[in-house]
């Protein structure tokens, strides 16, 4: 006897799956923690995939925004067909529908059903410009309707997230600029936020190139920002094209005892041949010579501007509105035998005794990188450099401890290969402005890194009971392997421990350089500027209660 298997065209298995011609059809939904940004065309809020190897006819997609702080913050909802692209880069997909959001649901309908198979989709939103930074967005797929069957709900559903609101402060293409990199952030004595960054005009790579230092100001806690200003631009100095007069890696320092604000930058004039160690000659706008201050012979011993990178400082005395002509302090802070002395990007500090301190970095006589500090004890009139704290380290930031000493938190090149429990930031302290350094107990064992710039910052606040408290904050890509998972961490014991209970994940995607800079906005709020997955310069404000700190007075 011959047995015949009858294959039904459609079998309903559940609200999550059905069989069509013997093949199971289902929907996977995925959410990630990334910020939803103001002043940007759209930001992804969820991804879903329809699992079926043959063509299906989609009639309707229902998206819900239950749990969103205020639906009226969302102006437009977009649906992108990403094809087989599983990334979260919606601009690489095909926009198939968009509509204004009037309630907690967005319904995308297709009069001519879309024929799809195994496709990824992204739902994205555009925020209104007046969306408060303390709001959040939450989204999910309610159901998808097919011509062939009843509606389906997702069978694999990633954990629901509340996406924080941020600002797309700088995006590639803004003001005709190719790329913005290297954030710094500070609060002035007038409670103005100053954000600074590399303005990489022609291409995205590091020095040497046509790069200036840009500044953005905010007087409302980061909700809105004034147009970009340029703080450091060496133009066509020495009759060389701007591509051979780049300034990069800026650091900002607010003098807490005066109206002075300083920005330091690394200036390269011309370019040195990486093979011969000699300055290139006859450079023109069409010359393709390139080298970088950290590469072989990128910067040489001595002080000649044609041979060694220069340490520049500019000053503002009007709350960051205008910036003075640059002052070259290379001869004050660089040892003649060093190949390089340069600012470390981010922000500097004012010590309790009024000393101004920049985190700095360099290369010694053997071209081995090091970290150190550069300081002024006379209100910025003159500057001195401390001795190297540790070798084979570079970018760093500093905080003052309660005993008056300085803690330096450093990017360590050893971590390129060290992925064991010994992976961690290099940490040293000094009690005498870098004359001598001591290894800290958390050296190489507390804060993991993928070898990347990071930020450490001391925030002092008043409690509900009127007491003063200080906490340390740290931000970096929280990974040993990739520049992903931008995270803020808190220490209540001056950097000895960083309990995971007080970590806040801001952006888990690894689509950026991963640099960051922290500052205070007010008693109860922290600001961060970082290189994020959704904008080259992303700004967010963070309330202390979001970090698990609930005893701060509200402003």
Protein language model features and the residues they cover:
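Bacterial Sec-dependent N-terminal signal peptides
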Residues: 1-23
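Short alpha-helical "patches" and their helix-cap loops
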Residues: 9, 139-141, 361
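Asp-box/BNR beta-propeller blade signature and adjacent active/binding-site loops
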Residues: 42, 56, 84, 92-105, ...
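Local alpha-helix boundary/kink/capping signal
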Residues: 15, 72-74, 322, 365
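Compositionally biased, intrinsically disordered low-complexity segments
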Residues: 7, 14-15, 30, 402, ...
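Exposed, polar/acidic Ser/Thr-rich sequence context and nearby capping/turn residues
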Residues: 23-163
